[in-house]
Amino acid sequence: MAALCPYTGSETTSGIGLAAEGVTPAPIRYGVDRGGGELTGLMRSFWAETEFMLSAGQEGCSSVILSAPSWDESWAEWYGLVFPLLECSVLSAGLGRTLGIVCFHPDYSTPDAAYLARHRFGHMHSTERLRRWLAEADPPLSDRTDDSLLHWAGSYQRRSPHAMINVLWAEQLEVAETKRKSKVLYSRNVAKVLQAGLVELERQSALERTDRP
């Protein structure tokens, strides 16, 4: 994940390279949900970690990575229940302009454009949008990449050994988007993933899942 994010300097620090925009690199906080696969337990874990981040402020905590291993085998529920519930919870708390949420999963697969039009929160950009960006940024690569491979390359950017919720500062996300346009960043990441290759990356992912605690 850090290899695809230009602002994550290591597994412990994020916000790298944004000092000119007023962002101070700060620690990444890691947490683990022990809710046993229950939505109520997951939400308690999410808000406990988020409250720590809010209390620490941007200089004390750059982001939160909350692992939820009990949800590793429940991709359908992860995007069908957890994503929408997180959205409602954050918006109900009046923090929609304060926090950015990104969700990861071992089996992440970007939903279709129709679903994303209703439930964009936390998801990867649609394959259709990635196609437009890639066609602008790297026409030759776009021409030789079919839709199924592009969908995989986009989905792979949200794969992780465990189900995971990444909590970020919305203000810092906006600064990052201003510094590096989305179409450039995501096209670069698609190229990296495609260069590594589907077979090799899926092999590495399988090993990560085997080794996870």
Where are these regions (language model features)?
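Expand to "…catalyze enediolate/carbanion chemistry for C-C bond making/breaking, isomerization
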Residues: 1-213
